[in-house]
Amino acid sequence: MALVVICGQPCSGKSIAAVTLAETLKESETKQSVRIIDEASFHLDRNQNYANMPAEKNLRGKLRSDVDRSVSTGEIVIVDSLNSIKGYRYELWCIARAAGIRYCVVYCDVDEAHCRQWNKERSDRGEDGYDDGIFEDLVRRFEKPERRNRWDSPLFELYPSREVIDKSSPVILEAVTYLTKTVDSKTQDVRILQPSIATQAARFSEANSLYELDRATQEIINAIVEQQSLGAAISRVTLGNELPPIEICRPIGLPELRRLRRTFVKLMGQSSLSGPPLPTDADSAKRRFVDYLNREFGGNNA
């Protein structure tokens, strides 16, 4: 339906803007279904999220993955986070383009002094504020959106330090109109992104890889169950096809095997966001799963 990226310095009123926009959309004539994806939904500590680059990269990966799953639900998805890096906003724009939906950026333009003051007030109230060092680092690295960039356009700018942001705010109403306006052949002021061949191919490739991973891991589970069902105690499961054997020192029940399989598939999906891609053939997927099981069984048997 649509993807809205909330952008701004730390403690610049982004969450207020996100909630206000969501409520206004829900109360609009079209009664839109809205979902806010924010950092709090992952139950992670704010300062831990930005303590170092790996932690920050992990947070962005979680947000991006959640957005990717949500844009096809028919809801308007609002991403309430710093979204301070232009390369990351470009990635979110690519998700919207691949889904063929509307996209916009809402920028909370607040000067550093006000953000710093609001962060201090939040900490003084015992709320979740940023540590001084982390706050200054985030301010320094912030990349302001520019409407000339396709991934920052259309750009709706709010000024929370100068005006109260509520459902009657002109910019909020303008954004609601953009997100809900009926599009026909005569509409010129609303743009629905069109997926390119490259983005469609990437989604097909990812879906194919997930299918291969799911099928290959299930075959390994079936082989373990089958060889254990022969009756005699075994310490090794042989798989053939030039795959290494699986070393086991105790009977492994089907519930445990299923749990390990689910964990492995989840880990593979998360690591593909920032590390090596998912395997595209069955043998590679099986080999990775066998290596994972040997590590798990080795640790459990020690």
Curated annotation (Swiss-Prot):
Function: Elongator complex-associated factor that is not a structural subunit but rather transiently contacts the complex. Regulates both meristem activity and organ growth; acts as a positive regulator of adaxial leaf patterning by modulating both cell division and differentiation. Required for an early step in synthesis of 5-carbamoylmethyl (ncm5) groups present on uridines (ncm5U) at the wobble position in tRNA.
GO cellular component: cytoplasm; elongator holoenzyme complex; nucleus
Disulphide bonds in the chain: none
Pfam families, per the entry: KTI12
Protein name (record): Protein KTI12 homolog
Tissue localization of expression: Expressed in roots, hypocotyls, cotyledons, shoot apices, stems, inflorescence apices, leaves and flowers.
Lineage: Eukaryota, Viridiplantae, Streptophyta, Embryophyta, Tracheophyta
GO process terms (BP): 5-carbamoylmethyl uridine residue modification; leaf development; meristem structural organization; regulation of transcription by RNA polymerase II; root meristem growth; tRNA modification; tRNA wobble uridine modification
Signal peptide start-end: none
Annotated InterPro entries: KTI12/PSTK, P-loop_NTPase
Keywords, alphabetical: ATP-binding, Cytoplasm, Nucleotide-binding, Nucleus, Transcription, Transcription regulation, tRNA processing
Region of interest (Calmodulin-binding), ranges: 260-273
Family: Belongs to the KTI12 family.
Complex formation: Interacts with the elongator complex. Binds to calmodulin in a calcium-dependent manner.
Species this chain originates from: Arabidopsis thaliana (Mouse-ear cress)
Locations listed in the record: Cytoplasm; Nucleus
Main localization of the protein described in the UniProt heading: cytoplasm
GO molecular function: ATP binding; calmodulin binding
Phenotype upon loss of function: Defective organ formation due to disorganized shoot, inflorescence, flower, and root meristems leading to stunted roots, few root hairs, lanceolate leaves, and a highly enlarged, disorganized shoot apex that does not produce an inflorescence. Altered cell division and cell differentiation in leaves. No detectable 5-carbamoylmethyluridine (ncm5U) modified nucleosides.
